[in-house]
């Protein structure tokens, strides 16, 4: 059976989560929510990158999560690579990545990833993954293998990893990352603690904060980063409380963006946050001590990650 036959998406994926999705009236998108389509050279680069990814049997979160910035990022020659397959063991109802039973790890993926990054001549890459609760280390060793192979092939390339929470395997995962820590360690809190059972079934807010703090304690020179979505029913004050928690756990880089509903089978958008409010989040974050804060309607965790890393002194 091929992966598409076993991959659940939308309503099929979220049908068995503990807190059921309650349909809401679809809000009209405001004028500041605009998806940019590439043209000319950007369109050509977009097609080149897609062809290269298929040739090397690689996945990107840009495609699998239906990111609205895919045309802009591919058009500029950047991509966020998603390792360990395209099937996730979690059923998060905000995310468009498919759920199901994953395939065994591809032992050649680290080399194939490194070859692709080298061929694309990328100065900065983001490597992320699906959740792999089926693996004893949550996939930590595969991350490290990808980091090592990429550095061997492209010594000047800076590497950011966007990792899952390694539920129940955190101590093992942290020890493995000691072998080859990334240049930036990113783990997204996604939302406020009140909404965790609804938005992140299987995850734990305090556990995610612990991951970020303990990694930083082991690697004080490696910046830590986290991201949030708005529009799921949180309040501005709750977002600011999360920012304080992140700073209390030594997180230095931040992204906040507008949640956009991938399908009617996903959590509805309950509010569109005005750009002025995003600016307020950014101002408050910098006042709290974040080295860099990217806050805006179309911001995603790895959107312009290279520029954010540059602002934090990584590149």
Curated annotation (Swiss-Prot):
Binding site for [4Fe-4S] cluster 2: 88, 92, 95
Lineage: Bacteria, Pseudomonadati, Pseudomonadota, Betaproteobacteria, Rhodocyclales
Catalytic reaction(s) noted: [[Fe-S] cluster scaffold protein carrying a second [4Fe-4S](2+) cluster] + N(6)-octanoyl-L-lysyl-[protein] + 2 oxidized [2Fe-2S]-[ferredoxin] + 2 S-adenosyl-L-methionine + 4 H(+) = [[Fe-S] cluster scaffold protein] + N(6)-[(R)-dihydrolipoyl]-L-lysyl-[protein] + 4 Fe(3+) + 2 hydrogen sulfide + 2 5'-deoxyadenosine + 2 L-methionine + 2 reduced [2Fe-2S]-[ferredoxin]
Underlying gene: lipA
Keyword match Transferase: yes
NCBIfam families per the UniProt record, alphabetical: lipA, PRK05481.1, PRK12928.1
Annotated pathway: Protein modification; protein lipoylation via endogenous pathway; protein N(6)-(lipoyl)lysine from octanoyl-[acyl-carrier-protein]: step 2/2
One Pfam family from the record: LIAS_N
Protein name according to UniProt: Lipoyl synthase
Sequence similarity: Belongs to the radical SAM superfamily. Lipoyl synthase family.
Domain of life: Bacteria
Subcellular location: Cytoplasm
